[in-house]
Amino acid sequence: MAFQKAVKGTILVGGGALATVLGLSQFAHYRRKQMNLAYVKAADYISEPVNREPPSREAQLLTLQNTSEFDILVIGGGATGSGCALDAVTRGLKTALVERDDFSSGTSSRSTKLIHGGVRYLQKAIMKLDIEQYRMVKEALHERANLLEIAPHLSAPLPIVLPVYKWWQLPYYWVGIKLYDLVAGSNCLKSSYVLSKSRALEHFPMLQKDKLVGAIVYYDGQHNDARMNLAIALTAARYGAATANYMEVVSLLKKTDPQTGKVRVSGARCKDVLTGQEFDVRAKCVINATGPFTDSVRKMDDKDAAAICQPSAGVHIVMPGYYSPESMGLLDPATSDGRVIFFLPWQKMTIAGTTDTPTDVTPHPIPSEEDINFILNEVRNYLSCDVEVRRGDVLAAWSGIRPLVTDPKSADTQSISRNHVVDISESGLITIAGGKWTTYRSMAEDTINAAIKTHNLKAGPSRTVGLFLQGGKDWSPTLYIRLVQDYGLESEVAQHLAATYGDKAFEVAKMASVTGKRWPIVGVRLVSEFPYIEAEVKYGIKEYACTAVDMISRRTRLAFLNVQAAEEALPRIVELMGRELNWDDHKKQEQLETAKKFLYYEMGYKSRSEQLTDRSEISLLPSDIDRYKKRFHKFDADKKGFITIVDVQRVLESINVQMDENTLHEILNEVDLNKNGQVELNEFLQLMSAIQKGRVSGSRLAILMKTAEENLDRRVPIPVDRSCGGL
């Protein structure tokens, strides 16, 4: 009883405090709203993009080389860096951007895919009366509304259910979520509401039923993060920014200011990672927007600069779509160690995450088995015991590095800033660090404001509120129907193209190959179970894709959805890219191997493989072992103790099934632990044991052998009189 009173008191005090804050901030909020309206009007009157399509990478490199001096040079092609380039170029500043890898190759493509204000930050704002947290939530909610508006094809509101298992939590969480709606104000997506236990189970039938009291549903935004980042960069390029991926900054250029006598940063020495060519790019102002690599650029400027980035790894996993409703997510507000776990539908799959672990900065973060199992255990806690959560159902996993920062100007150097930090060095290098995906635009605005002030640049106000990103302006929810009717694409593919490219989907459809079937007329898929088509590979090159990794992870999202499917699609993707980019056989093989290494280490294939290669005792019942041995010996007719491609082909031919030899080789290679071109009986039994345990969700070889066995067993012996053996 005392505890319940304490909870009520906390709600009343916290709510009252926030109401006071809200009251005091109304005038400021009104002023900001008027300013934002002015910005939207400015965006309406902004000149059309100078380029109908983004210039080619080669054209961008020539611009970088031949421009005597830019106003702004941005280092980093993530969400914040691309946002800075777009903000600067739409103010009329001569802008350049360089990225040493691909756009969104780092943290910006490895997020939870949410556009949110941060419910947990609001909770802290109330409980600790923290005005900074409150302002951060309010800013994020405004930016959430803007992002959903300017890229409607890549983003949408998503209802998220918060299950409640204790009666006293229901009013506590309800007050918190209603305050979230209140802080959003006119930017509230949809009003939150309470569900009874029965209604909660109707919406989310896989929820843990025992002790469930009810649930609260609130709304946040969801997006395709890598494609959103790319849309920002492409929009900046269309407005005239010279943007180039695979351009590494090897050093900063400096010169002495004749008026002040101070040494100032005046550009960067850049290296084309693809060719090795180096040249200088000069600029009045250089912006460091490199996320987790913030300190490495700061130390180029000043080798004694104190580190401000405190990197933290966040791991996510992808599971089959049946683990969650198609259009509703779940929030676990208090995990076993106090963290928050999201469980969300995305691209017809289910994302679960995230973790929060201190880590070292690396361009190639690897998801750990420990973090994967932590997420799986938390998922088990919230799902019904009828749903068997298996390790083998993890189809992909990734780790993203959060660039948490300390403010170098703060007296307390140990405190981590929950908001972004704009730092200006003695030599004029501007660093933007911290923050989160949702607030990339306001971070960019603050950064360019600082650049204009520090370097006396002539520019107008920010014009990016209400400015449509590439593909968003003429998109509509029914656009995909025109793709079906005008081009003969199947509906699933058309919906995917519309949701990925927006009004640019027609250009992809024009490139689609004829299928040779009655229906669909065009649109050859890269893999049968996903709606990605070959035309996207060709179009992806127009979007600055330079490698096979770019294509499987950021132009399409195959690597983030299913690593096995991505590996299956790789040979065809490399073949198509090779034709467009004139790759020789050596280059194609190099691209194939690099992409497989990426899938193996960075996208969770390594952890998946280790579940299969675990040499622990085979745990199968004797009856199962006998059954699987019989299946194996139908292929191993010579009793060699192993099977090869020849054995599989022989059985398939006997049941009139044709299969490409390269595909067969890939299927056997998945199970061939010794990599000797043979699948031994012990390897096959390990595979079946791993499938039964749930370590591995399935295997193409296991499915193939089972299907072949069933076909062989269904054969009816031909009677003697039907075989001309009788009179």
UniProtKB/Swiss-Prot annotation:
It catalyses: a quinone + sn-glycerol 3-phosphate = dihydroxyacetone phosphate + a quinol. This is Glycerol-3-phosphate dehydrogenase, mitochondrial. Calcium-binding enhance the activity of the enzyme. Keywords: Calcium, FAD, Flavoprotein, Metal-binding, Mitochondrion, Oxidoreductase, Phosphoprotein, Repeat, Transit peptide. Residues 1-42 form a transit peptide. Belongs to the FAD-dependent glycerol-3-phosphate dehydrogenase family. FAD binds at residues 71-99. Ca(2+) binds at D672, N674, N676, Q678, E683. One of its GO terms (cellular component) is mitochondrion. Pathway: Polyol metabolism; glycerol degradation via glycerol kinase pathway; glycerone phosphate from sn-glycerol 3-phosphate (aerobic route): step 1/1. GO terms for biological process: glycerol catabolic process; glycerol-3-phosphate metabolic process; NADH metabolic process. Residues 623-658, 659-694 form the EF-hand domain. GO terms for molecular function: calcium ion binding; glycerol-3-phosphate dehydrogenase (quinone) activity. Its EC number is 1.1.5.3. The keyword Ligase does not apply. Calcium-responsive mitochondrial glycerol-3-phosphate dehydrogenase which seems to be a key component of the pancreatic beta-cell glucose-sensing device. It is found in: Mitochondrion. The modification Phosphotyrosine is found at Y601. SMART domains: EFh (SM00054). Its cofactor is FAD. Pfam families: DAO, DAO_C, EF-hand_7. It comes from Macaca fascicularis (Crab-eating macaque).
